[in-house]
């Protein structure tokens, strides 16, 4: 289950990369 972290776009990008 993908859950986007409540933060800025930077955080989103970091989460996306870590998702890998």
Curated annotation (Swiss-Prot):
| Broad class of enzyme this protein falls into | hydrolase
Molecular function per GO: alpha-amylase activity
- This protein's source sits in the domain of life called Bacteria
Q: Which reaction does it catalyse?
A: Endohydrolysis of (1->4)-alpha-D-glucosidic linkages in polysaccharides containing three or more (1->4)-alpha-linked D-glucose units
**Temperature and function: what does the record say?**
Optimum temperature is 70 degrees Celsius. Active from 30 to 75 degrees Celsius, inactivated following 150 minutes incubation at 85 degrees Celsius.
* Keyword line: Carbohydrate metabolism, Glycosidase, Hydrolase
Give the enzyme's EC designation. 3.2.1.1
pH-dependence annotation: Optimum pH is 4.5. Stable from pH 4.0-7.5, activity decreases drastically above pH 7.5 and below pH 3.5.
Activity regulation summary: Strongly inhibited by Hg (2+). Inhibited by Zn (2+). Activated by Fe (2+), Mg (2+) and Ba (2+).
Q: What is known about what this protein does?
A: Alpha-amylase active towards amylose, starch, amylopectin and maltodextrins. Has lower activity towards glycogen, and is not active towards alpha/beta-cyclodextrin.
Record's protein name: Alpha-amylase
Species annotation = Bacillus sp
Q: What is the lineage of its organism?
A: Bacteria, Bacillati, Bacillota, Bacilli, Bacillales
């Amino acid at each position: 289950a993908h859950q986007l972290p409540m933060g800025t776009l930077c955080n989103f990008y970091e989460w996306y990369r870590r998702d890998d």
